[in-house]
Structures are given as structure tokens and as C-alpha cells.
Regions:
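ATP-binding/phosphotransfer module of carbohydrate and carboxylate kinases, centering on a glycine-rich
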Residues: 1-114, 118-141, 181, 201, ...
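Phosphate-binding/catalytic loop of phosphoryl-transfer enzymes
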Residues: 89, 103, 141-148, 152-249, ...
Length: 376
């Protein structure tokens, strides 16, 4: 008898998970449609939906004008996307950026704070927590926080090594934030989150093998292989580090140009590149040459990634993706000349928001796993 009871309980949980996944797809559905899609009886579907309504994971939709027919109108349901919120945070050397989203991934608020690469680790932690607290739309609804950070991040959320922010090396980031934030906290490498965002809502949607090239105040890579994020055996996949002279020297031409034209202004590498791009768009031939030299340096480095990995797509992302054809076209021409199977090269439309948006997706994925496990 206990075995029968246990089997029935397990079956109900499996059916609940199936119905919740259907609702999670975003469509408005009737009980009949739910029952058919989940392959359960209509009474079973109705009982599960009532339970999901009580737990606020589902909501009943109002009847739309023109729906009324003879008899009782069909009840219609959808996933209750506003029942909770998640926050995605991009921790960079020069900025902290947060995005608050509902469970459907709709962005509710965005906040940005400028920081210095030399900021001590303890102060950076405080700034992250303060940003999260400021980003909370409704404290009762906050369900998870995900953080993307530069550097090698292991499975425990520890920053094993960070070239861009040396002070960050060795910080137990997930553990430190979990002590200060009262909801589940996830930590991942920023470049992996950037390519995740592109695959979710960017130019890489529908692609399975993608190289994401980050261009900002530094250079980084994110890899999607076979439709999955590639972390590597030491979670160091995509790290350029300080051994790649080609990438370290990539900024030299745009920095030299900016210092020559406007020597009184102190700029970061990314700001120097942005300055050169802006001047190139205005018709400055010297600026255009500096930007093309920058693009070719990037392309030379990409060759060593593209030939062995054979991706379908290269996404040029980060703050400098706004350069568009000024970066993309020289890179595409070089890859066309020297790679076995040249991938398409495109500029990201997400710009500097990709890491925070990828963190939102990571938090939502965590909630989905938790929710379906609890249901099933």
C-alpha cells in the first residue's frame, strides 16, 4: 500500500513538472490544451493547475473580448512571470552593472556604478552588495542573484585568478556574497555569461558553435560548443591571460592615436579605442587606420581559435561592438583569407549589457532547475 501511495505521489509530481514546463514556455493555454500536451486527463490537469495557482506559479487569464461563445468559456492560464524577480550583476574592472528581471526575463530596472580597477577586494564586495540592494524592486519577490566576474571562476564560485583585477584573485566570491545576500547566489565567468546572453537574446540565437570576442578595456573570449557553454577542465576556457602578446598589443595603435590627438586626456584602453572609432566615423583617415590595425590584431588572435574550433559564428561584443563595420569587416576579411572554414563575423546588439543579461539568464536557469526539482 505504501508503494502504491509513493508511486502515485511521484506520478503527480512528474505530471506537475510537465505542466509547469508547458506553462513556462510562455503561451496562454486552456486546461484541455494542457492535458493534451502533458498527456494527462483533464481532471488531473485541473487539479495540478489549481495547486500551481495556489502556489502562485500560474495565473488565470481574463477572458478576452470576442472569446465569448455559447456555454461556459474555457479557462485560460499562463506562467506567473511576475511572481518573482532575479538580479544579474556584471562585475568589471571599471564598472558594476545590474539588471533586475521578472521570471519571464523582462528587464525591470538597470543600474550602473563606476569603480576603479585598483579598488580593494573588500570595498568591491561592499559595492556589489550595495548595488544588489539598490536593484531590488520588491524584496518579497527576490528569488536569486547571479554575478558575472572577470577571471577564472571555479565551481565553488571562487575567483582562482584575475589578470584584469589582481586584487580579486583568491576571493571566495560566492561564499562572501551568500553571507550578505539572503537568496541563492551564483557566480560565473563574465565571458561565459556574455555568450550565454547572445545565445538567449542576441545575434547567436539558434547557433550551436559560437566564439564570443569581448572588446572593451580588455580582450576576452566566451565559447559555446555544441550548444553548451564550454568551461574547460580548470574553468579557464576563454581566458586570454597575460601570455598573449597579440591581444595585449592590440590596443597599441588606438592608444597611440588618442594620445597624439588629445594628449591632455587620460583614457583607459577601451576609451582610447572608442575615441578613435568616433574620429574614424567623422572621416579622420589616421583614426580609421588605427582602428583597422586594432581590428587586424584581434583577427590574428582569432585565427588560433577559429581554425581548431570551427565555429559557425564569431560575435564581436563588449563596449566596442558599437564600432560595427569598422571592426567587423577587417576581422571578416582576415578570417576569410587565412582560416579553413571562415565563420560569419557579426557585431553584438547587446553591447556592454551582455554580461549582466547573461547573469539574468543564469539565475533564471537556476530557478527553473529548482522549481522543476521541487515540483517533481
Amino acid at each position: 500500500m505504501r508503494q502504491e501511495s509513493g508511486d502515485a505521489s511521484l506520478l503527480r509530481k512528474l505530471n506537475s513538472a510537465a505542466i509547469l514546463r508547458i506553462l513556462r514556455g510562455g503561451e496562454v493555454v486552456t486546461l484541455t490544451e494542457l492535458a493534451r500536451a502533458a498527456r494527462v486527463s483533464r481532471p488531473t490537469a485541473e487539479g495540478i493547475v489549481e495547486d500551481l495557482l495556489a502556489k502562485q506559479w500560474a495565473e488565470e487569464c481574463a477572458e478576452e473580448p470576442g472569446d465569448r461563445q455559447r456555454g461556459r468559456p474555457a479557462r485560460r492560464f499562463r506562467f506567473h512571470g511576475t511572481a518573482g524577480h532575479v538580479i544579474g550583476v556584471d562585475v568589471g574592472g571599471y564598472k558594476l552593472l545590474s539588471m533586475t528581471a521578472d521570471l519571464n526575463g523582462e528587464i525591470l530596472a538597470t543600474r550602473k556604478v563606476a569603480v576603479s580597477p585598483e579598488l580593494p577586494a573588500a570595498e568591491r564586495l561592499k559595492a556589489i552588495v550595495a548595488l544588489v540592494e539598490e536593484s531590488i524592486v520588491d524584496s518579497r519577490k527576490l528569488a536569486a542573484v547571479a554575478v558575472g566576474t572577470t577571471g577564472v571562476v571555479d565551481e565553488a564560485g571562487r575567483v582562482v585568478k584575475s589578470v584584469a583585477i589582481p586584487e580579486w584573485t583568491g576571493v571566495e566570491l560566492q561564499a562572501e556574497l551568500a553571507r550578505r545576500i539572503p537568496v541563492p547566489v551564483l557566480v560565473e565567468n563574465d565571458m561565459r555569461l556574455a555568450v550565454l546572453a547572445e545565445h538567449w537574446r542576441g545575434v547567436a540565437k539558434g547557433y550551436r558553435d559560437v566564439v564570443y570576442l569581448f572588446t572593451g578595456n580588455r580582450i576576452g573570449l566566451g565559447l559555446l560548443i555544441g550548444g553548451a557553454l564550454h568551461r574547460g577542465s580548470h574553468a579557464a576556457s576563454g581566458e586570454i591571460g597575460d601570455q598573449s602578446s597579440g591581444y595585449r598589443l592590440a590596443f597599441r595603435n588606438v592608444i597611440d592615436y588618442a594620445m597624439t590627438v588629445d594628449p591632455g586626456e587620460l583614457r583607459s584602453p577601451g576609451q582610447s579605442a572608442e575615441f578613435a572609432v568616433a574620429r574614424a566615423r567623422e572621416g579622420d583617415e589616421t583614426a580609421a587606420q588605427a582602428v583597422e590595425a586594432f581590428a587586424l590584431r584581434l583577427a590574428e588572435g582569432l585565427v588560433t581559435i577559429v581554425n581548431p574550433l570551427d565555429p559557425e559564428l564569431v560575435v564581436v561584443g563588449g563596449g566596442l561592438s558599437q564600432a560595427g563595420p569598422l571592426l567587423v569587416e577587417p576581422i571578416q576579411r582576415h578570417l576569410n583569407r587565412v582560416t579553413l572554414y571562415p565563420p560569419e563575423v557579426v557585431a553584438s546588439r547587446l553591447g556592454g549589457d551582455s554580461v549582466a543579461l547573461g547573469a539574468v539568464r543564469l539565475a533564471l536557469d537556476h530557478l527553473d532547475r529548482t522549481l522543476f526539482t521541487a515540483t517533481a
